[in-house]
Amino acid sequence: MLDLTELEKSLGVKFENLSLLEQALIHTSWVNENPNHLSGSNERMEFLGDAVLGVIFADRLYHDFPDIQEGDLTRFRSLLVRRESLVRVALGINLGKYLYLGRGEDASKGRFKPANLAGAFEAVLAAIYLDKGIDATREVIFRLFKTEMERVQTLSSNIDYKSRLQELVQAQFQLTPRYRIIDFSGPEHNHLFIAEVYTEDKVLAEGSGRSKKEAETSAAKEALQQFENSFTAEDNI
């Protein structure tokens, strides 16, 4: 059995049942060369880990972004659980070093193959879940995926507002909101743009940003806020 002490430290988890972590590291190629190994490969644990990862991120996104619709929540979750994200995290904890691989797979750089790393990482999450429960697994995921979660936070501030405003305005008034830059200031390399969103001859709101897109997004967000405030006021009458 490999010494998994350093891997436990990287994960921030001390296993009660270390055989779960070992099982998560066993690739099918190793099982094929060791037929007497009774517990099989990590594929079943990979299945469980994938589900655990998905539900933890779905829960986090649902509570962090109450105003964002299902389509964008799904896109955010896909960004978090995609193979590239899993591989980055797996490389960060040097997971490939600990994989049980068959000789041929090892010789063909199997310790660095994205599919092997992503699958093993999902299996490791399953091992943590089975050994420590959902709360401990959640803590590990949020710590290891900090970079990906920060990216989603940034994306959430720049998307959705324009499409949501368009849906609202079209539903309420059968009009399509448009955007225009009405002013800018500051040096050429660091302009501050002012945008307004309007329908026909009615200005709905203004917004500002360091790019035209950011200014338009800000205007859409402000317009949405005004609509929401007006709806709330009507409800209270």
From Swiss-Prot:
Compartments, record wording: Cytoplasm
RNase III domain: residues covered: 4-133
Transmembrane segments: none
Binding site for Mg(2+): 46, 122
MF GO annotations: double-stranded RNA binding; metal ion binding; ribonuclease III activity; rRNA binding
PROSITE patterns (alphabetical): DS_RBD, RNASE_3_1, RNASE_3_2
Keywords: Cytoplasm, Endonuclease, Hydrolase, Magnesium, Metal-binding, mRNA processing, Nuclease, RNA-binding, rRNA processing, rRNA-binding, tRNA processing
Purpose of the protein: Digests double-stranded RNA. Involved in the processing of primary rRNA transcript to yield the immediate precursors to the large and small rRNAs (23S and 16S). Processes some mRNAs, and tRNAs when they are encoded in the rRNA operon. Processes pre-crRNA and tracrRNA of type II CRISPR loci if present in the organism.
Name the UniProt record assigns to this protein: Ribonuclease 3
Species this chain originates from: Dehalococcoides mccartyi (strain ATCC BAA-2266 / KCTC 15142 / 195)
Source species taxonomy: Bacteria, Bacillati, Chloroflexota, Dehalococcoidia, Dehalococcoidales
